[in-house]
C-alpha cells in the first residue's frame, strides 16, 4: 500500500465498512461458517489440467473450492475472478442465471481480499484456462482493508517483515519459502529418527547461561525470586542426558542471544543440537554432510543448488581443512610453529588483523581465520582444529594440545554448523570454566560461566561423545536462496515502528 495515499485508503475503508453494514442489514453473516472443500487449486490442476475442453464438458465434474479474491472483472450478468488458496490460484466464472440474483449481487459487490466459497463445474475457457463455473457463491469473510496493489505488491521490505500476513497473501515466492522451511525440518527429523536418535525437550530458562559464547537475555522468576537466563544453547542439558544413558539425542528448539540484528543474525532463532555417545567429531562430520545432502535431495530433488551468484555442490564428501592450514593457505602465515603472544600480536599488526589487548595466541589465530579466510569459503568446507582458548567445551587434540577436536562448517562464507568431540574430563572442564571466568573479569561478557552442576554430572562419567549444532534458519536461507535471515523467519525481531 506504499503507493496508496491516506485519503484513498480511508475512502476504501469507509466503502468496505458500508458494505459490511449492508450485508448485516440483509441478514448475511459477513464472517461466515465452515465451508467444505473438495479440492485445492493444486489438486484441480493436477487432476483436470490435462483434460480437453470437450472432455470436461462431457464429464461435468462438480467441485467445491474456497479462497481469497485476488482479481475480479466483468460487467452486467457475468464476471470472472481469481481466488487464491495455499497452493495457487484458480479462475472462477459467475453468471447471474446460474447462481441467482442474491448470490450474484454478493459476487458483484465483493472486494479484492474477500474470502469466498464456490461450488460449480470444472471447465476450460476458450484460451484453455482451467476454471470453475459457479453454481453457488458464498461469502465466507469480508475483508475490511484493501490489499497492496497487485502489480507492485509490498515494495517496502520492512513492511513485508512487520506484516508477514500481507507478504504471504501477495507473494507466492515468500509462501513457498516457508513451506520449504517446514519440509527441511521434517526431513531433518526423519533422517535422525531413522538413524536411531531420540528427540527430547529441555528447559528454555536456565539458572546459568552456558553452552556457547554469547550475551544472554535475563528474566526474573517472581515466585522463586531468582534470575533466569533464556538459553543461549541447548548443549549442556543434552549432555547431561548422555551421562544418564540416552546415547543418541537431539532437540530442535528456540535459542536466544542478546546481540545485534543483521542479515545473518536474529536474537531469537532455531537450532538443532544432537549428541551421540561413543562417537567423535569425525563421525559427526560424516553425519552432517550426509544429513544435509539427504535434506537437499528430499526437499529440492538435487544436491546442486544456487545461492546468489554461486552454484553450490552439496554432494559428499566435503573439503576438510585444519584452521591453521587454512590460514597458511590463504594468508601465508604459519601458526603451526610455537610462538609467544607477542609474536602473534606482531603478525596480526603486520596483516591488519584487529585484535584486543586481552587476546592470547589461540584467540589471535581465530581472528586471522574470521577476518582473512572465512569469506573465501564458498563450497562446503569443514574447518577443524580450533584453538583451546575459544573452545571451552571441546576435547583437546591428542597430537597437539593447543588445538581441539572441533569443526565448523562453512558454506557461502557463512558458518552453518559447529561440532566437536565433547570434553568429558570433569577436571579439565573445571579448569576451562575457570579460564573463562578470568576472561569475564577482563571484560568479555560472552565468556562461559562456571556450571558446577554440569561438572558434577561429568564426574559420574560421560562416555566419549560427538556433538553438533546447526542453525536451522541459515540452512533454510541456503536451501531457499534467501539473502537475509528475515526472509526465512515468519516474524523476525524488529525495532519499534516509528509513528
UniProtKB/Swiss-Prot annotation:
Belongs to the class-II aminoacyl-tRNA synthetase family. Keywords: Aminoacyl-tRNA synthetase, ATP-binding, Cytoplasm, Ligase, Magnesium, Metal-binding, Nucleotide-binding, Protein biosynthesis. This is Lysine--tRNA ligase. The keyword ATP-binding applies. One of its GO terms (biological process) is lysyl-tRNA aminoacylation. Mg(2+) 2 binds at residue 415. Gene3D superfamilies: Bira Bifunctional Protein, Domain 2 (3.30.930.10), Nucleic acid-binding proteins (2.40.50.140). Mg(2+) 1 binds at residues 408, 415. PANTHER family: LYSINE--TRNA LIGASE, CHLOROPLASTIC_MITOCHONDRIAL, LYSYL-TRNA SYNTHETASE. GO terms for molecular function: ATP binding; catalytic activity, acting on a protein; lysine-tRNA ligase activity; magnesium ion binding; transferase activity; tRNA binding. The keyword DNA damage does not apply. Binds 3 Mg(2+) ions per subunit. HAMAP family: Lys_tRNA_synth_class2 (MF_00252). It catalyses: tRNA(Lys) + L-lysine + ATP = L-lysyl-tRNA(Lys) + AMP + diphosphate. It is found in: Cytoplasm. It comes from Bacillus cytotoxicus (strain DSM 22905 / CIP 110041 / 391-98 / NVH 391-98). Its cofactor is Mg(2+). InterPro entries: Aa-tRNA-synt_II, aa-tRNA-synth_II, aa-tRNA-synth_II/BPL/LPL, Lys-tRNA-ligase_II, Lys-tRNA-ligase_II_bac/euk, Lys-tRNA-ligase_II_N, Lys-tRNA-synth_II_C, NA-bd_OB-fold. It is an enzyme of class 6 (ligase). SUPFAM superfamilies: Class II aaRS and biotin synthetases (SSF55681), Nucleic acid-binding proteins (SSF50249). Its EC number is 6.1.1.6. One of its GO terms (cellular component) is cytosol. Homodimer.
Amino acid at each position: 500500500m506504499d503507493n496508496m495515499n491516506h485519503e484513498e485508503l480511508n475512502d476504501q475503508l469507509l466503502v468496505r465498512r458500508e458494505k459490511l453494514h449492508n450485508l448485516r442489514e440483509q441478514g448475511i453473516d459477513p464472517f461466515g461458517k465452515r465451508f467444505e472443500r473438495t479440492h485445492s487449486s493444486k489438486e484441480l490442476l493436477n487432476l483436470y489440467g490435462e483434460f480437453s475442453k470437450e472432455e470436461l464438458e462431457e464429464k461435468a465434474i462438480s467441485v467445491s473450492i474456497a479462497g481469497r479474491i485476488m482479481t475480479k472483472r466483468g460487467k452486467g450478468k457475468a464476471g470472472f475472478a481469481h481466488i487464491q488458496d495455499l497452493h495457487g490460484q484458480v479462475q472462477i466464472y459467475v453468471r447471474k442465471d446460474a447462481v441467482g440474483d442474491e448470490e450474484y449481487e454478493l459476487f458483484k459487490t465483493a472486494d479484492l481480499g474477500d474470502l469466498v466459497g464456490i461450488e460449480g463445474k470444472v471447465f476450460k475457457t476458450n484460451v484453455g484456462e482451467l476454471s470453475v463455473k459457479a453454481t453457488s457463491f458464498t461469502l465466507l469473510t469480508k475483508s475490511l482493508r484493501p490489499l497492496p496493489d497487485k502489480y507492485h505488491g509490498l515494495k517496502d521490505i520492512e513492511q513485508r517483515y512487520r506484516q508477514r500476513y500481507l507478504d504471504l497473501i501477495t507473494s507466492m515466492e515468500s509462501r513457498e519459502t516457508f513451506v520449504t522451511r517446514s519440509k527441511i525440518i521434517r526431513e531433518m527429523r526423519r533422517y535422525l529418527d531413522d538413524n536411531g536418535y531420540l528427540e527430547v525437550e529441555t528447559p528454555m530458562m536456565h539458572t546459568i547461561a552456558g553452552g556457547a559464547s554469547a550475551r544472554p537475555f535475563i528474566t526474573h522468576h517472581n515466585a522463586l525470586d531468582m534470575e533466569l537466563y533464556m538459553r543461549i544453547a541447548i548443549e549442556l542439558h543434552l549432555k547431561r542426558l548422555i551421562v544418564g544413558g540416552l546415547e543418541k539425542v537431539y532437540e530442535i528448539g528456540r535459542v536466544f542471544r542478546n546481540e545485534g540484528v543483521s542479515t545473518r543474525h536474529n536474537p531469537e532463532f532455531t537450532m538443532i543440537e544432537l549428541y551421540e555417545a561413543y562417537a567423535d567429531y569425525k563421525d559427526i562430520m560424516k553425519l552432517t554432510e550426509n544429513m544435509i545432502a539427504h535434506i537437499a535431495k528430499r526437499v529440492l530433488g538435487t544436491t546442486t543448488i544456487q545461492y546468489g551468484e554461486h552454484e553450490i555442490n552439496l554432494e559428499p564428501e566435503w573439503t576438510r581443512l585444519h584452521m591453521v592450514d587454512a590460514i597458511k593457505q590463504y594468508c601465508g602465515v604459519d601458526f603451526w610453529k610455537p610462538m609467544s603472544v607477542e609474536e602473534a600480536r606482531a603478525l596480526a599488526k603486520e596483516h591488519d588483523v584487529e585484535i584486543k589487548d586481552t587476546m592470547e595466541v589461540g584467540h589471535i589465530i581465530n581472528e586471522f581465520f574470521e577476518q582473512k579466510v572465512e569469506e573465501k569459503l564458498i563450497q562446503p568446507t569443514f574447518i577443524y582444529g580450533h584453538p583451546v582458548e575459544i573452545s571451552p567445551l571441546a576435547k583437546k587434540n591428542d597430537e597437539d594440545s593447543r588445538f581441539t577436536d572441533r569443526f565448523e562448517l562453512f558454506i557461502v562464507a557463512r558458518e552453518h554448523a559447529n561440532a566437536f568431540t565433547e570434553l568429558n574430563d570433569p577436571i579439565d572442564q573445571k579448569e576451562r570454566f575457570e579460564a573463562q571466568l578470568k576472561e569475564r573479569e577482563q571484560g568479555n561478557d560472552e565468556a562461559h560461566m562456571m556450571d558446577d552442576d554440569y561438572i558434577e554430572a561429568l564426574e559420574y562419567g560421560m562416555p566419549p561423545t560427538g556433538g553438533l549444532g546447526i542453525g536451522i534458519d541459515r540452512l533454510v536461507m541456503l536451501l531457499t536462496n534467501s539473502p537475509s535471515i528475515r526472509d526465512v523467519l515468519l516474524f523476525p525481531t524488529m525495532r519499534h515502528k516509528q509513528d
